[in-house]
């Protein structure tokens, strides 16, 4: 007889959890703009971690690299290889951009699973991975869109726009739409995957003993890394495509 009330209470609990995760925000008024305060806080933490780690690792570069220097050299080599594969021989100027995107997204995604954000109480909302907020993922996707337009115009001048009528002018609307949907697909893919991962872990922790969600958390770490790689790879591929002029 108590099954139905219990089920209703369980569903209500899940609804409350999801409401906290995606519906409440700490708003800051900066000038005439209203921003999500918790996103800025966690983003600053991620940036501080990245800058601090790099500064400590390479402040005293050695001819024979230490462990930390070795690690960052490996990361740089990985990003250079990724950029060269997707962009081509003119990849050099784009390595800092692709590397910044990859590292920020990677650390942001992992921070959602590894950092004890929940113990920090806010007046409204709660701290989570920066990429758990659609504003962050859109802010990452828009510079990518600007970057591939800039790359194409720099390489080809106004002739870049001729690609919209290739192979036939009848495809003009579709080709234009394709370029403007790229940032949407980048931002929503990253946001959806990170949000879903965090919600799944929160729901499992609330329903079952804490040891059970651990495999899901490890899977989330793997997925978070893959999402950072996908974003960086697609960003580099879009830049390379705009410079080469083929789809």
UniProtKB/Swiss-Prot annotation:
The chain crosses the membrane at residues 38-58, 95-115, 134-154, 199-219, 220-240. CDD domains: ATP-synt_Fo_a_6 (cd00310). The keyword Ion transport applies. Belongs to the ATPase A chain family. InterPro entries: ATP_syn_F0_a_bact/chloroplast, ATP_synth_F0_asu, ATP_synth_F0_asu_AS, F0_ATP_A_sf. SUPFAM superfamilies: F1F0 ATP synthase subunit A. One of its GO terms (molecular function) is proton-transporting ATP synthase activity, rotational mechanism. One of its GO terms (cellular component) is proton-transporting ATP synthase complex. It is a multi-pass membrane protein. F-type ATPases have 2 components, CF(1) - the catalytic core - and CF(0) - the membrane proton channel. CF(1) has five subunits: alpha(3), beta(3), gamma(1), delta(1), epsilon(1). CF(0) has four main subunits: a, b, b' and c. Keywords: ATP synthesis, CF(0), Chloroplast, Hydrogen ion transport, Ion transport, Membrane, Plastid, Thylakoid, Transmembrane, Transmembrane helix, Transport. Key component of the proton channel; it plays a direct role in the translocation of protons across the membrane. It is found in: Plastid, Chloroplast thylakoid membrane. This is ATP synthase subunit a, chloroplastic. The gene is atpI. The lineage of its organism: Eukaryota, Viridiplantae, Streptophyta, Embryophyta, Tracheophyta. It comes from Piper cenocladum. Its main location: plastid.
């Amino acid at each position: 007889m108590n099954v139905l009330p219990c089920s209703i209470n369980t569903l209500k609990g899940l609804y409350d959890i999801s409401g906290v995760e995606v519906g409440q925000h700490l708003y800051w008024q900066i000038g005439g703009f209203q921003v999500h305060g918790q996103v800025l806080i966690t983003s600053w933490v991620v940036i501080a971690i990245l800058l601090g780690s790099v500064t400590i690792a390479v402040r005293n570069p050695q001819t024979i690299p230490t462990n930390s220097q070795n690690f960052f050299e490996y990361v740089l080599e990985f990003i250079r290889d990724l950029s060269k594969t997707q962009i081509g021989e003119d990849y050099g100027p784009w390595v800092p951009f692709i590397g910044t995107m990859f590292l920020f997204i990677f650390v942001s995604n992992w921070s959602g699973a590894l950092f004890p954000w929940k113990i920090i109480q806010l007046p409204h909302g709660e701290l989570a991975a920066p990429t758990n907020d659609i504003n962050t993922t859109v802010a990452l996707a828009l510079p990518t869109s600007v970057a591939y337009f800039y790359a194409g115009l720099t390489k080809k001048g106004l002739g870049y726009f001729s690609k919209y009528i290739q192979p036939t002018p009848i495809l003009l609307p579709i080709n234009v739409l394709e370029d403007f949907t790229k940032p949407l697909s980048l931002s929503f893919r990253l946001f959806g995957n990170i949000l879903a991962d965090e919600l799944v872990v929160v729901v499992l922790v609330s329903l079952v003993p804490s040891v059970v969600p651990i495999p899901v958390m490890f899977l989330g770490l793997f997925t978070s890394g893959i999402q950072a790689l996908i974003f960086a790879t697609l960003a580099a591929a879009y830049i390379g495509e705009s410079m080469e002029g083929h789809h």
